[in-house]
Amino acid sequence: MAKVAIMGYGTVGSGVYDIIKTNSDKLSRSANGESVHIKYILDIRDFDDHPEKELFTKEFNDILNDDEVSVVAEVMGGLHPAYEFTKSLLEAGKSVVTSNKELRDRAFGDCPREKCKLLL
């Protein structure tokens, strides 16, 4: 089972959540037959009314230190703390998916693809 985390739960983050939930069968076929499961959603806000409120954490280290999490979607936007979090995740051997062009251009522009696992 591929376990993923989402960092940020605004418009884009909630969209990523919906896509994973709605298309889990298609994603499983793309992930070498492994089912794709959301383990964490990182956000500073409370989501007490969310049907899966147990997924939410305010602690980045929950994601960083969990060896089961292999892929993280960075959808926080901006440069900080997205850069620090992404750098730590990459150093820990996790793959990071982001659409954050500022993060890519300013912080990881010279990072070799074979080393970074930073997907845009």
What do these predicted regions represent?
Residues 82-92, 99-120:
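Rossmann-fold NAD(P)-binding glycine/threonine-rich loop
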Residues 1-91:
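N-terminal glycine-/serine-/threonine-rich beta1-alpha1-beta2 phosphate-ribose binding loop
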Residues 71, 97-100:
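Structured catalytic core of nucleotide-sugar glycosyltransferases
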